[in-house]
Amino acid sequence: MSSQGNKYEYGELADKLILAYSKRRLFKAIGTKRDRQQQFSRLDNKDKRFISKLIDVSNSNEKHKIPSELDIALDCIDLAKIYEGVDKREYERESKAKDPNLIYEDFIVLELLHYFKHDFFKWVNKPECSRCKQSSNNIVPTGNSGPPSINPSEISIIENYKCTKCNIAVSFPRYNNPIKLLETKSGRCGEWVNCFIFILRALLGSQSQIRYVWNHEDHVWCEYYSLGLKRWIHLDPCEGVFDEPNLYCENWGKKMSWCFAFGETYIMDVSDKYITKSDKQINKLESVSSLKNIKEFIDTLNDDKLVRYYSNMALTASDENRNLMRLYQEVILIHNSEKFNKENKIEVSRTHNIPTGRQTGDAEWTKSRGEDGNE
């Protein structure tokens, strides 16, 4: 038999093995999904609270991916200014051999980071009084209240203040709906990341891979998968930094316990990527009772995502083999590759001249959070 015939047979055999593996993986995930409620009931209250938070974060990131909604984002930003900067970066790469591994998509991300921080979004320490337009010592906190019963703007909490100069109430609703944030263009790290991800998804298109990163010690950021660099890239829109996973521990001096990345197809514990100094690692057992239970339940949540992804494919395409092959290539292979390569340390490109300590938020606030760069 010719070598060409052997290659065809080997390729056909490989496809059969992949299809069989994908089918077994799918059936296992379906079975695990049925047992999820029972698995949750066996957890103690500490682990239940932690898992419930992960579920809430995961669910919130399933929203606002409809193309018609994403088009709203494109109508709200200065595309001409962004693409002018992208073209300049591409010219510098070609003429000065600068950033040779970055591709056009990476330049879009870099330029959006700059535009979003310097031209589009505003940081809020305290809300501004509607009458005197001041937001300094005249604004004093008076407590928090819950969201309204009808809540299209997805308010998580309302911070209440009083202007001592005007003697009027001032409120600061913490919006999660990115469409609302396109109007307000202001907030703290949660609002910044929600709005930034929404715009980034609109710019890069439906095939882009973007995920939300949640830290248990009250910070959030995001990542996208760079086809040029062939890995997940850290982005912090609040700070305007690109590919700086060492930022939090080594620059801010922040102590952390857990960091999770929430993508469309799976959740990944990325604590090792971002907690880069052993003296900044908070014992994970301070927030949970069983590391094993948390890992197993995250596996269950990932099974849910896998089943949902396959079900959505099956709604539009009836070819089972094709759907199983797509499931392998678009979900299983990527997840397994990241899971098995977590221990490989990747040399990251560093942004030049990053100042020490967190730049967003006032000095008292960053110091209270252990993010001011002082050990």
Curated annotation (Swiss-Prot):
S-S bonds: none
Annotated Gene Ontology cellular component terms: cytosol; nucleus; PNGase complex
Active site residues of this protein: 189, 219, 236
Subcellular location: Cytoplasm
Comp. bias (Basic and acidic residues): 364-375
Reaction(s) catalysed (UniProt annotation): Hydrolysis of an N(4)-(acetyl-beta-D-glucosaminyl)asparagine residue in which the glucosamine residue may be further glycosylated, to yield a (substituted) N-acetyl-beta-D-glucosaminylamine and a peptide containing an aspartate residue
Chief localisation class: cytoplasm
Protein name per UniProt: Peptide-N(4)-(N-acetyl-beta-glucosaminyl)asparagine amidase
Lineage summary: Eukaryota, Fungi, Dikarya, Ascomycota, Saccharomycotina
Gene transcribed to yield this protein: PNG1
